[in-house]
Amino acid sequence: MITAPAGSPDLPFMRGKRRLTWDQLGRLHEAGMEIGSHTVTHPDLTRLDEAGIAAEFEGSRAAIADRVGAPAASLAYPFGFYNGRTRTLARAYFDCACTADLGVAGTSSDVYALKRLEMHYFRHAATFALLASPRLTQYAAVRGVLRAVRLRLRC
């Protein structure tokens, strides 16, 4: 994960975590993987005005295009925070956007508010097997409820 220019100090939420280098991202792109945007400075986009959001989207797309050779087609909202304004602006820059909402995306999903599965929940063999199971949607829904309760208890 690249969150800032090389040599910049760690962001608090990334302290001690390894990030991919631009070279590694370039090799992943060459191997056929898409490199998506996560913005330039990882702000809460819901607190920015339209110009600030646009600058984050434009800056990240330009940096990725310059370093990897192709602009980002997808976005992962920082912190998973999004609202109507961020979704509207995302449409102008990206083909789709992922939230931090836990769930399974389907054909009827809003492509600018895609739910996703965090692989953290599938690190054990028993839960990993759910990825190919018809029970995946139910499992994701239960995990989503538990996660929402946990987040509310933190406030």
Residue ranges, per PLM feature:
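C-terminal active-site subregion of NodB/CE4 polysaccharide deacetylases
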Residues: E30, R47-C155
